[in-house]
């Protein structure tokens, strides 16, 4: 540990930067909290908030996503080799096979089995360091009816507004 409180090796300080997209205050706050904790253990971690994310040039990034309506919605794009939202260039043949087979079936039991295979493969070879699940708190007047609290899964889940067209107000 150096005099500045950070580890070095061969004269080079152990350091990295977490990039976070601008306009995502919740993720900016999470990145800043993580950086503070990482600095406390001797790694010089900083946060940058670029106007435009350079997906090929960052050291680390804090992102989030969800598949609120169907597991295939974002999962295939995020974890499939060479897919559009696979920003980390993750590649795993078992993950690709499970995701491809799951999206080719309309049988819920078959899809569930393939998504279980996907989760096992991803757990054995993680694409990311998953650090949290962002949840949400909502408050509404008791005069509003139709909100189903069981579907509230944060801003990436189904969300509170999934059935807004059926809500009524006394």
Question: What do the PLM-derived regions correspond to, one by one?
Answer:
Residues 1-35, 117, 169:
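Append "and occasionally in soluble cytosolic enzymes with long acidic Gly/Pro-rich linkers
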Residues 4-7, 46-50, 110, 114, ...:
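Surface-exposed patches in mature extracellular/periplasmic domains of secreted proteins
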Residues 13-15, 40-44, 57-59, 125-128:
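Loop/turn elements at helix/coil->beta-strand transitions in domains of secreted/extracellular proteins
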Residues 29-50:
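Long, His/Glu/Asp-enriched segments that create or flank divalent metal/ion-associated functional microenvironments
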